[in-house]
Swiss-Prot record:
One of its GO terms (cellular component) is cytosol. This is Putative pre-16S rRNA nuclease. The keyword Nucleotide-binding does not apply. It comes from Lactobacillus gasseri (strain ATCC 33323 / DSM 20243 / BCRC 14619 / CIP 102991 / JCM 1131 / KCTC 3163 / NCIMB 11718 / NCTC 13722 / AM63). SUPFAM superfamilies: Ribonuclease H-like (SSF53098). Could be a nuclease involved in processing of the 5'-end of pre-16S rRNA. It is found in: Cytoplasm. InterPro entries: RNaseH-like_sf, YqgF, YqgF/RNaseH-like_dom, YqgF/RNaseH-like_dom_sf.
Length: 143
């Protein structure tokens, strides 16, 4: 069962895909979006759903450190509702506190990407990988 992991931001959506067995997550791409123009990248997501035979989505919920929800959580939930309407596939949510910070640390310390411009190109994808991998591990433990 393949899942798409999505890190939804105000200007981009980082995308990751699970392997067919649902064990690991790999980065795919970053999709540019523009809320003011109602451009949410659904055409590109449709291509990915078809290409990889996706059976569901995992979106990060960027809660505040105290566990409360802010505007970013609402944006992710609205995006999830849009996905449900367009694709009629299940949408799961995963707490994503600090995934972007963690992704940045991994890119610098483990991948040796010190240039901020280069990190910015892939940080959303890396955050999507962390969100999806966390979900895959959590659901595997539940089985």
């Amino acid at each position: 069962m393949r899942l798409l992991g999505l890190d939804v931001g105000s200007k981009t959506v980082g995308v990751a895909i699970s392997d067919p067995l649902g064990i690991t997550a790999q980065e795919l791409e970053t999709i540019k979006i523009d809320e003011s123009k109602f451009s949410f990248g659904m055409r590109q997501i449709r291509k990915l759903v078809r290409k990889y035979d996706v059976e569901g989505f995992v979106l990060g919920l960027p809660k505040n450190m105290d566990g409360s929800s802010g505007h970013s959580v609402e944006r992710s939930k609205q995006y999830g509702e849009r996905l449900k309407e367009k694709f009629d596939l299940p949408v799961h949510y995963m707490d994503e506190r600090l995934t972007t910070v963690q992704a940045d640390r991994i890119l610098v310390q483990e991948a040796g990407v010190h240039d901020r411009v280069e990190r910015k190109k892939v940080i959303d994808q890396m955050a999507a990988v962390l969100i999806l991998q966390s979900y895959l591990e959590a659901t595997r433990k539940d089985k």
